[in-house]
Amino acid sequence: MEHSRIIGFFSNFATFLWNDNLLPVGVLTGFVSFFMTENRPYILISNDDGYQAGGLNFLIDTLKAVADLLVVAPDGPRSGFSTAITSAHPIHAVLVRKESGLTVYACSGTPTDCVKLALNRYIERRPDLVIGGINHGDNSSVNAHYSGTMGVVQEAAMQGLPAVAFSLCDMSAKADFTPLRPYLIDITMKALMAGLPEFTCLNVNFPKCPKFEGVRICRMARSRWINEVKDLDNAGRSGDWYWLVGDCQELEPDATDTDRWALSHGYVAVTPTTLDNTATRLMPMLKSLF
């Protein structure tokens, strides 16, 4: 309990100082590391952009001072794989980095495969937390259903582990993750301290801006993708060729309690999600029919 109080105090204090430009990054990570030298948390990390992605490596650099990290990530981009698993052929993994408190594997499978492999073969002990990300791109609203980053944390939640997905609304390979650092530590520490109910996880999205207005706890906005298919010249190839593209259509643009609203107004959007897809509101009507 004392350890939890220290974590809670520090995460709030660090974010306050950072927001007022009073706490340099080196002091931030050093101060956390001082309190975490014993009984360091053990965190499993994966993503859908691959083990070489900037977002993943920024996350590693941020959290390695406060936790022991096991990273099992795809060996290349796997965006849009959601919770897909590989069953038609074997997968393989290669150790690509090993140092004190950090082990990194590159896996040929999907993000969900990576979590399954880690939990069944590579963990030293049961992880205290599983993190997906940092994703290059927006995983708010309906995007969460397609996301391999969310696939990571959903698989963890299925296994009874607390899990958090981090995404930045910037698809650039050279995206600037610097403003995220204190929030990554703060949210990670709070997730470690408080835990999460079984079969739930957090979807955390950061807007693309140099400084955030704060954190908003919000629901998923209702939206859908439209204009999703673009014709492509077949260039002599057989059959019809297309690009899957599209525009995200907001279905409730005036709602102020959604992740899309929070992001558009400069807030970090934290959305609690659940694995239970039951439409409970439909049950009374269906029972009356059957």
Describe the function of each predicted region.
Residues I45-Q52, N143-A144:
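Short, glycine-rich nucleotide/cofactor-binding loops
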Residues D138-S147:
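Glycine/threonine-rich flexible loop motifs
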Residues A157-P179:
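Glycine-rich phosphate/pyrophosphate-binding loops
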Residues M1-F13:
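Extreme N-terminal basic, low-complexity initiation segments
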Residues V152-A156:
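Hydrophobic/aromatic ligand-binding patch that stacks against planar heteroaromatic rings
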Residues E38-N39, I43, G54-R121, R125-R126:
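A cross-family phosphate/adenosyl-ligand binding-site feature
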Residues F177-F290:
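Electrostatically charged, flexible surface regions
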